Design a protein with these regions (language model features):
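Alpha-helix initiation/capping motif
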Residues: 35-39, 93, 124
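Single conserved hydrophobic/aromatic residue that forms the stacking wall/gate
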Residues: 1-11
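SAM/dcSAM-binding transferase cores
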Residues: 96-142
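Conserved Class I SAM-dependent methyltransferase catalytic core
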Residues: 40-97, 101-102
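Mobile active-site "lid"/loop adjacent to the S-adenosyl-L-methionine
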Residues: 12-13, 18-45, 49
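Phosphate/oxyanion-binding loops and surfaces in catalytic or ligand/nucleic-acid-binding neighborhoods
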Residues: 21, 79, 107
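Flexible, active-site-adjacent loop/turn segments at secondary-structure boundaries
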Residues: 2, 19, 32, 112, ...
Length: 142
């Protein structure tokens, strides 16, 4: 995103599945490491550049590991962004959330943050109706 900053372009919608492994085991494949680890693109850097490229009423959508929620909250505050929606993604009922879907805005939201929960499976390969509804266009056997 650094190459776009300063171009004068702004975007109404930004969607990112950023690198999010921090200080974790790496593999021999450098390209894979670059895509998956925060060595070359931290969440702070991503949000700083995204904020600069965000239209006044635009939105940034992210998926992160759930354990990065506090870090995201700190970054949002630093970049003068606002959390408008958050979804905790849970693999199976009773499990801890594994992912966080977050939507950020540059302007304070009119309503409080909308929080929801998405459970993926009821049991192994028995997907919830909500998950099927959201993903059926992307899978052949859903």
């Amino acid at each position: 995103s650094a190459c776009l900053v300063g171009s004068g372009d702004v975007y109404k919608r930004q969607v990112s599945n950023p690198p999010y492994f921090v200080d974790s085991l790496k593999c021999p494949d450098q390209k894979r490491n670059t895509a998956r680890h925060t060595d070359t693109l931290t969440l702070e850097d991503l949000l700083q550049d995204s904020r600069k490229l965000l239209a006044p009423q635009g939105r940034i959508a992210l998926i992160l590991p759930y354990d990065q929620k506090e870090r995201l909250t700190d970054c949002i505050r630093t970049q003068n962004l606002y959390l408008s929606k958050e979804t905790s993604v849970i693999p199976v009922p009773g499990a801890e959330p594994k992912r966080l879907l977050a939507e950020l805005t540059a302007e304070p939201p009119v309503f409080p943050t909308f929080s929801s929960q998405l459970t993926i499976e009821i049991a192994r390969h028995q997907y919830t109706d909500e998950y099927v509804s959201l993903t059926k266009d992307f899978y052949l056997k859903m």
